[in-house]
Amino acid sequence: MDHEILNSYSRLNHLNVSRETFSDFENYISMIIEKNNKINLISEKTASKKAIIERHIIDSAQIIDFIDLKSNTTTDLGSGAGMPGIIVAIILKNMKNNMNVNLYEKSYHKSSFLKEVSEKLKLNTKVFQKNIFEIKDLETGTIMSRAFKPMPVVLDLVYENFFKFKNIIFFMGKSGKNVFENSKKKWVLEYTEKKSLTNEDSFLVNIKKIKKKL
């Protein structure tokens, strides 16, 4: 892999990511670009290789420190093109961690793409072409929510549909502070925050416990 490509991933150096993992990232990016010409996996604004690395790969990979690595599964809500779920699965493969990454995506074409990527890169994933709002009694370790639904909707979903989980990771954008503060009016949350690597106005929220306010 050339020096320029490795430099693109420099913000992930602290994760000690191997060259094999970078190679998996590169193959994944190629598959996204090729498939995006046929179906709308990601926005055209972020569909260049440089944008995919900076806006999607790095953004998704930065949550690995929040993943409960002792759990049997982690779950990506509304996985879309696979970010963060596929990215996390690639890193777990590099770590030789056999955790299952559950990818929920109701779109036939996107779920087919997720299966194709998982097979080609030999990832430990399970793809569910289902609407997660219709599934009850779910159990998992970490729940990941990136560009899925607003925080209040996801909190309600987790409260109603998951009987057991370790933590929920939210990717929050520019308006995230207001959304987060409004959510705390309805919920008692045990959480930590972390500044995003990709945007100074963005941040991550790692919620370990949720409880509805009376």
Give a label for each model feature.
Residues 2-69, 75, 108-112, 116-123:
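Class I SAM-dependent transferase core
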Residues 32, 172, 207:
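Residue-level signal for inorganic ion chemistry
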Residues 61-140:
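Conserved SAM/SAH cofactor-binding pocket of Class I
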Residues 73, 142, 166-169:
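Short glycine-centered segments of the SAM/dcSAM-binding site in methyltransferase folds
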Residues 131-133, 173-177:
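Short, polar loop motifs at secondary-structure junctions
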Residues 140-147:
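Short SAM/SAH-binding signature in class I
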Residues 155-168:
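A short glycine-rich, Lys/Arg-flanked "PGG" loop and its adjoining helix->strand segment in the class I
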Residues 175-214:
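Active-site capping/gating segments
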